[in-house]
């Protein structure tokens, strides 16, 4: 089964931008709020489309949804994860299936997302869990491409997705003990550095005392 290229013109039309042009039984996905530059660039590989960081995200330790305005960024601490809502809203026909994979350029920085799927018939924005497996804090700006979407053809007999699209909802409120543990996890690097600094200071003072 081959990958369907992202094309906005016949005879390989696979992407449309308006509800009027979308056909539920067709073979073109509807992408609203698209990055047109990706789709119009003749030198860009059109086997994938890079989904972008949208205007909402949620830290996996936090029970509130956080807004992300133009020019702002998400700071991903080492070992941390966030659920990012995509800038794009999609609507899939019954003839296409979507697969979401990490971007190689971000993997080199330790940033990876959970591989996800988009069923035929799905309509809505996408929520992508993204991790920082690296050792440094990394930033993802609003409208940065952070994961890659692949299109795959679907054979006859498929039962389309028939449920509301995804949206951010608050997580259950954690206990005081869990919040304390989360606080320690987030600041683990700084706490480790602080202990190391105090230890070194103690050693230096001891050496100075001996030399005197």
Predicted features along the sequence, with ranges:
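DUTPase catalytic domain/fold
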Residues: 1-212
